[in-house]
Amino acid sequence: DQLNDTTWIFVIVQDPGKNEHFFGLEDAETKVSYIPAFRSKEDAQDCLIHLPTRKGKKYEVQAVMYGDLTRDAFGNDFFVFMLDGEGKITDKIYPPQSDAPVH
């Protein structure tokens, strides 16, 4: 399935509520900062237990439109990586005209 701006995907939100923000990670190989995103709520929930979260912080899976996520991510120097329920990267989404490595 092709993702477009109105496709609903799922992300992990840190500190849900007034100070919430998307949960981000850094790719160990490329040192690229990215927001992990998922095609299903179940995949996001399954993967959350495997991610390096901070003790004392709250995390919540939320739906977001793909276009809103990529605009926010790219505007804050993050990329978007699609993950499966086991945390494997299935797709790397870089901003248009990015010099980022595509491997």
What residues fall within each predicted segment?
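Conserved NAD+-utilizing ADP-ribose enzyme module
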Residues: 1-103
